[in-house]
Regions:
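N-terminal helix-turn-helix DNA-binding core of bacterial DNA-binding proteins
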Residues: 33, 37-81, 105-112
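N-terminal leader segment of winged-helix/HTH proteins
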Residues: 1-49
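Short, hydrophobic-biased segments on the C-terminal half of alpha helices
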Residues: 87-88
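Alpha-helical elements of the RecA-like P-loop NTPase motor core of helicases
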Residues: 28, 70, 116
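Conserved segment of winged-helix/HTH DNA-binding domains
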Residues: 108-129
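Beta-hairpin "wing" of winged helix-turn-helix
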Residues: 91-101, 108
Length: 129
């Protein structure tokens, strides 16, 4: 939007309020529901870890149940080294857990919340099609 004041033109962005006005009650209600700094940091870290397509494929593969590193590498097309590295990152973010049986290491989703997060994400991107 362009506003003319005498001989000067002022450009006001369309994606901002033209007048600053704050609804204190609404702001207070929303602020109460915001996560604290630590929770925000942990949530952002979880999403950061999920920002890699290879790690997303690993998580989606684990929606089907527990798999060993060799199987995960085969199903995702990642090398076993890349697979292990990405699984270590997912484990440090508490998205997956592992157990060792003999000479094999098996991974699974850490809890049902991860399944829900992925299911909702997959539904969301499916809406575009």
């Amino acid at each position: 939007m362009i506003v003319k004041a005498s001989d000067q033109s002022v450009v006001v962005p369309l994606d901002r309020c033209e007048v600053a006005c704050v609804d204190p009650e609404r702001v207070a209600a929303v602020a109460e529901r915001l996560p604290d700094e630590r929770e925000s940091q942990r949530l952002a870290e979880s999403f950061r870890v999920l920002s890699d397509p290879g790690r997303v494929r690993l998580i989606v593969a684990l929606l089907e149940g527990e798999l060993c590193v060799c199987d995960l590498a085969a199903v995702t097309g990642l090398s076993e080294t890349a697979c292990s590295h990405n699984l270590r990152l997912l484990r440090s973010a508490r998205l997956v857990r592992y157990r060792k049986q003999g000479r094999n290491v098996y991974y699974a989703l850490d809890d049902a919340h991860i399944r829900l997060l992925l299911d909702v994400g997959l539904q969301h991107i499916g809406e575009d099609e």
